[in-house]
């Protein structure tokens, strides 16, 4: 029986895009009676709560499991020990003896030596979490992190107050992994699996060992690496029979064009395509570009699975233009604000609702203020219910400069919301038929984009017609059956 392991650095409740596509893929494979689970390599003390939240929100299928390198060794340690490590908690409490507590605010206290007045510790508590920082010569030297009053991690700090060493503890308080951290760049150095008495050169070596333990070396074992940073972990295992695939979810070009510079991680995946079973990209245009740019053959086009949900029952007549994405430079939300300015000058009734978080949010907020657009452009923050937000939009706009596919645009079209997007690599031209189910705009032509938005917000019949055709096109182009068939053909080839 086939079993699929999909790899990514981390999972979290506020991850979209690639993570959502992995969740959808897992569900579709499970529906086809092929277990498809997710493997992560980061450390989170609250992963149990994160997985519960993802499943409760309906993002992650109830059948999908998450395997994690730290959880694996933690469980071994849990099974090895029967009693709590009382010495650990005694060690911590002894350091707080003979101190004076000064409460700074609710849940925050500082501790001073009762004899010398020396600053000893800082404690911050919340409902379920607590941290204790210990100081020496007024400099932080250690932090103990607790969840539900149990220590799960200790961090050691250098003289510059940067983490240089970490220790991880099991449910009973016993250390199971410790590792050196490069204080300058955060890179993981020598790692010690205390529970197994093993030493590893770095995090890569540890994760390779873990994958070899987790995944049986059989043709029915299928590894799909979605996270580009995790690819070396899969690539370097000694599996001879298990299948290995890399997936590229983004444009592989370094810049907003195709001048020849490539992203380092994606380039590494592509250059090693012939040494694994294959590399998957999401659009045929990207596959053809890669074949022209690199001396490789094992490149395949398979779209993300698209979740076809019911269309909204009502058509939005209010003049609301929507946008949902990470607020990062590649999305060029600054251009969206310039478009909004042009639109509002001609029709002050139009509103722009922008959902997302990211590094450029403060810059965008200032642009909105500087252009006096506060009554028309609204930053709504991160949303856990994008489909509900789509129901409020009359149309969706994208100023993104490059995509792997453009899943958020596809989701809008499923909801019968026409999309106005710059014609960039890769994605929009695959599913937007200009002047039939949306508009493809010459990149950076903000005047044309503004004009097309005005046409749609002021013509209910046209917007509804485009929206209906958009949904029909997506359902026809991205059927679950055809996408699943491509994967199965690849596995069986």
Swiss-Prot record:
The keyword Metal-binding does not apply. Disulfide bonds: none annotated. GO terms for biological process: cell wall organization; teichoic acid biosynthetic process. It catalyses: 4-O-[(D-ribitylphospho)(n)-di{(2R)-glycerylphospho}]-N-acetyl-beta-D-mannosaminyl-(1->4)-N-acetyl-alpha-D-glucosaminyl di-trans,octa-cis-undecaprenyl diphosphate + n UDP-N-acetyl-alpha-D-glucosamine = 4-O-([2-N-acetyl-alpha-D-glucosaminyl-1-D-ribitylphospho](n)-di{[2R]-1-glycerylphospho})-N-acetyl-beta-D-mannosaminyl-(1->4)-N-acetyl-alpha-D-glucosaminyl di-trans,octa-cis-undecaprenyl diphosphate + n UDP + n H(+). InterPro entries: Glyco_trans_1. GO terms for cellular component: cytoplasm. Changing residue 326 to S: Strong decrease in activity. This is Poly(ribitol-phosphate) alpha-N-acetylglucosaminyltransferase. The gene is tarM.
């Amino acid at each position: 029986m086939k079993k699929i392991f999909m790899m990514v650095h981390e999972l979290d409740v506020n991850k979209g895009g690639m993570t959502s596509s992995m969740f959808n893929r897992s569900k579709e494979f499970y529906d086809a009676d092929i277990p498809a689970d997710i493997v992560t390599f980061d450390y989170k003390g609250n992963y149990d709560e994160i997985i519960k939240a993802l499943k409760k929100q309906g993002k992650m299928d109830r059948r999908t499991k998450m395997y994690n390198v730290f959880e694996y060794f933690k469980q071994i340690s849990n099974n090895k020990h029967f009693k709590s490590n009382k010495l650990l908690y005694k060690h911590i409490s002894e350091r707080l003896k003979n101190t004076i507590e000064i409460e700074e605010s609710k849940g925050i206290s500082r501790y001073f030596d009762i004899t010398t007045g020396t600053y000893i510790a800082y404690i911050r508590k919340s409902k379920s979490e607590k941290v204790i920082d210990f100081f020496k010569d007024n400099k932080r030297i250690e932090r103990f992190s607790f969840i539900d009053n149990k220590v799960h991690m200790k961090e050691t700090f250098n003289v510059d107050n940067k983490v240089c060493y970490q220790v991880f503890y099991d449910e009973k308080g016993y250390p199971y992994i410790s590792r050196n951290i490069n204080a300058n760049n955060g890179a993981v150095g020598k790692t010690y699996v205390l529970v197994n008495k093993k030493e590893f050169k770095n995090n890569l070596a540890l994760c390779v060992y873990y994958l070899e333990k987790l995944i049986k070396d059989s043709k029915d074992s299928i590894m799909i690496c979605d996270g580009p940073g995790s690819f070396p972990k899969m690539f370097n295992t000694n599996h001879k029979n298990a299948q290995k695939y890399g997936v590229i979810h983004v444009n592989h070009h370094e810049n907003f064009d195709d001048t020849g510079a490539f992203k380092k991680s994606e380039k590494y995946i592509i250059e090693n395509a012939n040494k694994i079973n294959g590399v998957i990209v999401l659009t045929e245009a990207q596959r053809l570009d890669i074949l022209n740019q690199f001396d490789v053959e094992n490149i395949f086009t398979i779209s993300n699975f698209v979740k076809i949900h019911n269309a909204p029952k009502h058509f939005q007549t209010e003049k609301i233009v929507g946008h949902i994405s990470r607020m990062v430079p590649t999305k060029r939300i600054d251009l969206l604000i310039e478009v909004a300015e042009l639109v509002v000058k001609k029709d002050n009734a139009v509103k722009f609702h922008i959902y997302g978080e990211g590094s450029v949010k403060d810059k965008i907020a200032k642009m909105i203020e500087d252009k006096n657009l506060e009554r028309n452009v609204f930053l709504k923050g991160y949303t856990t219910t994008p489909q509900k937000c789509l129901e409020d939009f009359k149309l969706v706009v994208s100023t993104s400069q490059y995509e792997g596919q453009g899943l958020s645009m596809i989701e809008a079209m499923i909801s019968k919301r026409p999309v106005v997007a710059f014609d960039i690599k890769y994605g929009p031209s695959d599913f937007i038929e200009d002047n039939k189910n949306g508009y493809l705009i010459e990149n950076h032509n903000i005047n044309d984009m503004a004009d097309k938005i005005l046409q749609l917000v002021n013509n209910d019949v046209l917007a509804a017609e485009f929206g209906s055709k958009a949904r029909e096109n997506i359902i026809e182009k991205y059927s679950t059956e055809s996408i699943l068939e491509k994967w199965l053909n690849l596995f069986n080839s």
